[in-house]
């Protein structure tokens, strides 16, 4: 075995063997065994889901670890950190456009989804590669003249966060659409739900790993961790994409063909009153649950005096609550519960979670803070699963990427 493809073949064989070992356990021990289908067997499905692990890793790094490190260890102003952490969200509205373009993409290679997933991978890799150095310049740890550093630092840090955010959004939108394309129609909701759970697993696992690696914080260790995450991004996404989407000669450009217009497709999608109400609910609910992202870890560090490792573990608590919520939601939905009602229950669970975080400071109770973080994750999980299931109900065959982009 030699050549540049050899490492990919080794990784592919390793992941496939592990997937088959899990498959041998039987459906009783694999709650997502029913997500597999003849067109997308479980080993291939689990390998494809690796792109969600990468997105979860980046989310844990940006929203969790780097958020606190910039404020507490590097001394960056909280409002500046809030601005940078919020930059990836600027690309979120374009997820719908990315999904639409991947629905109708034509290329000489005959792929629709893979070019967008690879584009997102390279954007995320580039952002992570330059991020630690940009943060040190932003914090003033540089030999550049002060006036120049004051300009270069914010620009470089902003570019790094924007690249990572754009990469995450692009990869996830096209990846979910590819999973939906490959799965049989009756298995699609379970496949996309599995992808969401994989995202949370990535957040839990990477949150714990970052907590362990940065227990004794040093600038050199931060560079190693962030750039290591960049390498992991490339490797896992390559393994995830390897031989997933078949090349189709019918997707090559045709002379004189008029490309579909995004505006017409969007107006057709939102013509349904239910779709409009759904988008409002998703927007407001997501804003409610994500407002805490930029302040939760610095709050634990500055107010409750928790270490970098302890606050990094909060990401694992949030994602762990989300994983539990998915199990509860799956049970409720399998018994015929209304998806929108499940999402509403998630919003209600979030209320005591935020209250616990607020009262943890005057009571000086770190355990109450952790409990609040877990409840926020649980509520967000119910909300996400409920709205995801509702989004699958809004989906049309020709608008798979558009519908998933709108949900994202």
Model-predicted regions and their roles:
Residues 170-183, 382-396:
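Intracellular juxtamembrane helix-capping segments at the cytosolic ends
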Residues 80, 187-194, 310, 399-406:
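Cytoplasmic loop-to-transmembrane helix junctions
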Residues 64-80, 294-311:
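Short amphipathic helix-loop junctions that connect adjacent transmembrane helices
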Residues 117-150, 348-364:
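C-terminal ends and interior cores of transmembrane alpha-helices
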Residues 77-85, 153, 192, 306-315:
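Juxtamembrane helix-start elements in MFS-like secondary transporters
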Residues 342-386:
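C-terminal transmembrane helical hairpin of 12-TM major facilitator-type secondary transporters
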Residues 1-42, 147-160, 170-176, 182-291, ...:
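Intracellular loop-helix junctions on the cytosolic face of multi-pass helical membrane proteins
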């Amino acid at each position: 075995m030699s050549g540049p493809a050899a490492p990919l073949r080794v990784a592919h064989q390793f992941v496939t063997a592990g997937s088959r070992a899990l498959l041998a356990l039987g459906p009783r021990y694999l709650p997502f065994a029913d997500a597999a289908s003849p067109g997308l067997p479980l080993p291939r499905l689990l390998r494809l889901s690796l792109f969600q692990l990468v997105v979860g890793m980046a989310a844990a790094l940006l929203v969790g670890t780097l958020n606190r490190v910039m404020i507490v260890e590097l001394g960056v102003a909280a409002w500046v950190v809030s601005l940078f952490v919020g930059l990836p969200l600027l690309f979120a509205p374009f997820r719908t456009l990315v999904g639409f373009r991947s629905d109708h993409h034509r290329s000489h290679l005959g792929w629709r989804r893979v070019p967008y997933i690879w584009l997102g991978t390279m954007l995320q890799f580039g952002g992570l590669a330059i991020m630690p150095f940009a943060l040190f310049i932003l914090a003033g740890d540089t030999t550049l003249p002060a006036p120049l550093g004051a300009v270069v630092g914010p620009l470089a840090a902003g570019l790094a966060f924007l690249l990572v955010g754009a990469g995450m959004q692009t990869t996830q939108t096209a990846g979910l659409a590819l999973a939906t394309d490959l799965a049989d129609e009756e298995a699609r909701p379970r496949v996309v739900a599995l992808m969401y759970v994989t995202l949370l697993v990535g957040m839990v696992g990477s949150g714990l790993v970052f907590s362990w690696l940065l227990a004794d914080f040093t600038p050199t260790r931060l560079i190693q961790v962030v750039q290591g995450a960049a390498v992991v991004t490339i490797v896992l996404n390559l393994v995830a994409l390897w031989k997933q989407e078949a090349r189709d000669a019918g997707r090559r450009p045709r002379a004189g063909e008029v490309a579909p217009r995004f505006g017409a497709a969007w107006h057709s999608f939102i013509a349904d009153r239910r779709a409009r109400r759904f988008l409002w609910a998703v927007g407001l609910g997501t804003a409610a649950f994500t407002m805490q992202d930029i302040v939760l870890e610095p709050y634990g560090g500055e107010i409750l005096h928790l270490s970098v490792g302890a606050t990094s573990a909060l990401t694992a608590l949030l994602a762990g609550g989300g994983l539990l919520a998915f199990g509860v939601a799956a049970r409720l939905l399998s018994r015929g519960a209304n998806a929108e009602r499940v999402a509403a229950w998630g919003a209600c669970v979030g209320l005591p979670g935020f209250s616990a975080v607020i009262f943890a400071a005057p009571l000086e109770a770190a355990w109450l803070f952790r409990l609040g973080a877990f409840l926020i994750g649980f509520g967000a999980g119910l909300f996400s699963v409920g709205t995801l299931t509702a989004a699958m109900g809004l989906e049309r065959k020709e608008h798979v990427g558009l519908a998933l982009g709108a949900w994202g």
